[in-house]
């Protein structure tokens, strides 16, 4: 039996069971012909029933679609003359009554009970008029009240940080809101947009309410808006009047409404009219000398029927993107330098950006090649470009509220040109996996006033990975390496060499795939976050050991030191240990 036949059979069995039950119930009559076809949700079957709501009889049509019983029936008010949209919660423009949330699970094993429950829920919605639901789900109702033209506000900074006057910039169908033009410009440019060519700047009036608005209070005209603002504070209405009379520019109004779960946002757009220069408003006075109170009163009378455009308002700021309104400022204020944008480094950089680190600098001198594609965050479209620059573009476009810089050079050459190259960073990450580079970086970390450094590297086949955090206390990288950069506390012992040589070339590489790589990248990123949020007072090393059952397939075994530390029953283990000074280390033992 193929999938379509199986799903169709379950649907038909549920429908037959439902039809049999309703045939014996005189309260229901089957929908046929035009009545059923009038619904645009591809109806398969339907029934009508009449219910009594506050002394009035209302016919409900209960419509079954091809996804029943996985999805509940759709219930509509049949009389299109009864308009309860924005009067009763959960009633849509077309008369559909939303009885069960889209995300709610239903038990498909009981189709008749699901049908009756849905009808009972619809009656309850119509009877009780649960006003609180309008407040709890304000953004949904505000969005549906907008009509056909639906522009959106993108608020690029936390609403709590905005004063009563902010900046609004039109960028296509979006209106970008921020504390200043500069903050909006930076977000837009990080998102790949140039405001000079696409935008018009104006003012944004930020209005705060102690609770969300009910639909009956949604303003349609400037007169409605002034009345609403007066009820919320006389100074807010006066501020609106000043904006309207000031110029012909765009005026955006951002509603910030307090709820138990945070601020609910809504937007309104209108346009200033430059009424301070309207001669008719100056009757009896010299132009420009009308008392402000009288000017505003005359302006209000002229503008009271001016229409408003409602808009959704979306938060796109750091706090919301990364923590949904929770903490996050600590990470946003952090600055990290990552050296090495190869396979491991690219995923580490991506994770650090997703974690919300506010400023990231990427350093790598190499170009993206075809042989990198299979296990690198970047892909075919980036071939021939700088790994650091392509990664910067990828992260910056995905997370425009962050600041990402690329330095496509050998980090040592770059560092020699700067007086204090790493002084502005809270932490440095090295995933370059080249002993000549990492030994130099370790020297700087031990010899200078230097931020903490996290060194990340993989063992063969990425069956083990390490993240060594070097701070002022404890050991350094060389405390665990021999003179040739070989790790002396490795997890795996392999009889044969694991480096592979490229055909006809001089380059070597390690065999491993993305499935083993990504957990190791997570290990390194977590070490970075732990060091930033601390305290990590002394050096430590985090080690990830993957599926030990794969060791024999690779011709390897655990080192004797690690055999004693690991639980052979676990398929993946992380062990964090203090990294102490090696008495023979030439840097730490001085």
Q: What role is predicted for each listed range?
A:
Residues 274-336:
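N-terminal charged helix/coil linker that caps or initiates catalytic domains
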Residues 324-367:
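Glycine-rich adenosine-cofactor-binding loop
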Residues 33-102, 112-113:
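Compact alpha/beta protein-protein interaction domains typified by the UBC
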Residues 351, 417-418, 439-444:
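A short acidic, amphipathic alpha-helical/loop segment
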Residues 392-426, 432-434:
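A structured beta-alpha segment of the ubiquitous adenosine-cofactor-binding alpha/beta core
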Residues 133, 144-300, 423-427, 431-590:
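Glycine-rich phosphate/adenylate-binding loop
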Residues 2, 72, 79-171:
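Domain-scale recognition of soluble eukaryotic interaction modules
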Residues 365-401:
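Glycine-rich phosphate-binding loop and adjoining beta1-alpha1-beta2 segment
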């Amino acid at each position: 039996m193929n999938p379509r036949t199986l799903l169709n059979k379950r649907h038909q069995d549920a429908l037959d069971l439902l039809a049999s039950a309703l045939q014996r119930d005189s309260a229901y009559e089957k929908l046929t012909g035009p009545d059923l076809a009038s619904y645009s949700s591809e109806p398969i079957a339907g029934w009508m029933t009449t219910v009594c709501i506050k002394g009035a009889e209302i016919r409900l049509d209960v419509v079954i679609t091809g996804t029943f019983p996985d999805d509940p029936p759709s219930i509509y008010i049949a009389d299109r003359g009864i308009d309860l949209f924005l009067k009763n919660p959960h009633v849509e423009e077309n008369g559909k009554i939303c009885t069960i949330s889209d995300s709610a699970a239903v038990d498909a094993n009981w189709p008749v009970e699901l049908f009756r429950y849905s009808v009972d829920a619809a009656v309850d919605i119509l009877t009780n008029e649960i006003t609180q639901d309008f407040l709890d789900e304000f953004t949904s109702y505000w969005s549906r009240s907008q009509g056909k033209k639906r522009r959106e506000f993108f608020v690029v900074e936390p609403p709590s940080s905005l004063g009563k006057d902010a900046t609004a910039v039109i960028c296509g169908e979006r209106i970008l809101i921020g504390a200043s033009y500069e903050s909006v410009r930076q977000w837009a440019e990080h998102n790949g947009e140039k405001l000079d060519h696409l935008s018009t700047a104006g003012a944004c009036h930020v209005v705060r309410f102690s609770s969300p608005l009910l639909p009956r209070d949604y303003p349609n005209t400037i007169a409605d808006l002034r009345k609403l603002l007066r009820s919320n504070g006389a100074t807010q209405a006066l501020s609106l009047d000043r904006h309207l009379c000031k110029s012909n520019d765009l005026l955006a109004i951002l509603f910030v409404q307090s709820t138990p779960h945070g601020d609910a946002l809504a937007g309104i757009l209108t346009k200033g009219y430059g009424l301070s220069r309207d001669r008719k408003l100056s009757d009896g006075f010299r132009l420009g000398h009308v008392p402000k109170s009288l000017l505003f009163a005359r302006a209000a009378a002229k503008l009271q029927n001016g229409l408003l455009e409602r808009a959704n308002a979306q938060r796109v700021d750091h706090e919301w993107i990364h923590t949904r309104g929770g903490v996050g400022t600590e990470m946003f204020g952090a600055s990290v330098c990552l050296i090495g944008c190869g396979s491991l480094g690219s995923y580490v950089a991506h994770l650090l950006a997703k974690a919300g680190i506010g400023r990231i600098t990427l350093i790598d001198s190499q170009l993206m090649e075809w042989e990198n594609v299979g296990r690198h965050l970047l892909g075919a479209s980036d071939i021939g470009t700088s790994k650091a620059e392509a990664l910067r573009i990828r992260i910056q476009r995905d997370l425009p509220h962050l600041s990402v810089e690329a330095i496509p050079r050998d980090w040592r050459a770059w560092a020699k040109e700067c007086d204090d190259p790493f002084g502005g960073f809270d932490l440095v990450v090295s995933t370059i996996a080249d002993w000549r580079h990492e030994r130099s970086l370790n020297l700087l970390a031990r010899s200078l006033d230097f931020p903490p450094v996290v060194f990340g590297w993989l063992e063969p086949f990425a069956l083990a990975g390490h993240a060594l955090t070097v701070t002022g206390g404890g050991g350094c990288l060389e405390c665990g390496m021999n003179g040739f950069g070989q790790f002396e506390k490795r997890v795996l012992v392999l009889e044969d060499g694991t480096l592979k040589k490229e055909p006809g070339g001089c380059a070597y590489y390690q065999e491993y795939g993305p499935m083993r790589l990504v957990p190791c990248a997570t290990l390194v990123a977590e070490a970075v976050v732990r060091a930033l949020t601390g305290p990590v007072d002394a050096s430590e090393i985090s080690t990830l050991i993957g599926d030990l059952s794969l060791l024999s397939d690779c011709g390897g075994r655990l080192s004797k030191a690690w055999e004693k530390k690991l639980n052979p029953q676990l398929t993946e283990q992380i062990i964090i240990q203090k990294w102490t000074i090696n008495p023979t280390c030439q840097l730490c033992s001085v």
